[in-house]
């Protein structure tokens, strides 16, 4: 999801089982203002006049404005929106972040189980967990150091396979946490990895999927940004790559892929949260992921790519760069999206909206989905926005990790069964 947060922040050391100390958001509120006929420009004016940051910025009538308000601006803001509908997403954002960032301890060498999904975790604990998980299933999986981030962190991946051995079937590739603050995507992609491994030869549908595809799961595509959200700014989005001549670091990695790179769905301003970079594909992590995906494609091709995001409860298809163009495979993409959403909803009743990226959420240039479909020629290329629709937004309580994983797995299994069926 998109926003324009840019605060100066304090750093703190990451310690498992400790409450982390990022920038103090105590007293900040997050308020949703649904736009209606005639008030879009007024809501935009309030945001500009009070110099407020947004999690969602309203561009048209009917879109929600999810607005972050510092304590000093709350009286003015509430006066300005008097008479408008509003919903409090976070009464005290600092308290919500404090509750979310109390990590449960994880000891390397522990046999992973469902308890991992009771809490969010530090970057280093994610590496230990993935290696421990793979260690339980050595004959049909491998832990892969897929490459290094700009700051030298490991970009981890799990590679899973069934009958026929590794690299013998078309690949499924899942990406999580390309946007640093979207922590639920890290946990949900790991839940799917855990389920595909632990339920193989127990659950017939999962066994069939693992036997029919090579599965590659990259839970932390943007490790530098992810680590930064745990030490300095919980709401950071981009990577941490410096921008020469600019005071603001980072580029939005999902605006940096070398396809339809320039357009209104990205920014040339290094301080923007949707900064596309100085050149197409110049992000350190994007270079790593392009190289990995090309390598995987060279084996038996890529049957499906899914880039997991939050928040919004959406499951979307190409294109992001255009709201009018459609790929030749549009009907198949829409069919599979509906199958995913229906199966997901059957688990906990969570509704998902489906459709093309541009017309469903907003216009995007240089995104992974369009690049994978048009440049790498992946057969099916999709993206999701996981829970929720805005009640908690990016700061999703830990008690929603497990239900998010359960319903996303159900949707994914149903969708991949349909792919196998043809």
Swiss-Prot record:
Active-site residue numbers: 385
Location, primary (coarse class): secreted
Entry's Gene Ontology cellular component terms: extracellular region
Pfam families in UniProt: Peptidase_M14, Propep_M14
GO molecular function: metallocarboxypeptidase activity; zinc ion binding
The protein's enzyme class: hydrolase
Keyword Metal-binding part of the UniProt annotation: yes
Cofactor: record remark: Binds 1 zinc ion per subunit.
Signal peptide range in chain numbering: 1-17
Binding site for Zn(2+): 179, 182, 309
Domain of life, per lineage: Eukaryota
Residue pairs linked by disulfide bridges in the UniProt entry: 248-271
Limits of the Peptidase M14 domain: 119-419
Entries under Gene3D superfamilies matching the protein: Metallocarboxypeptidase-like, Zn peptidases
Family: Belongs to the peptidase M14 family.
Name used for this protein in its record: Metallocarboxypeptidase A
Lineage, highest ranks first: Eukaryota, Fungi, Dikarya, Ascomycota, Pezizomycotina
Gene name linked to the record: MCPA
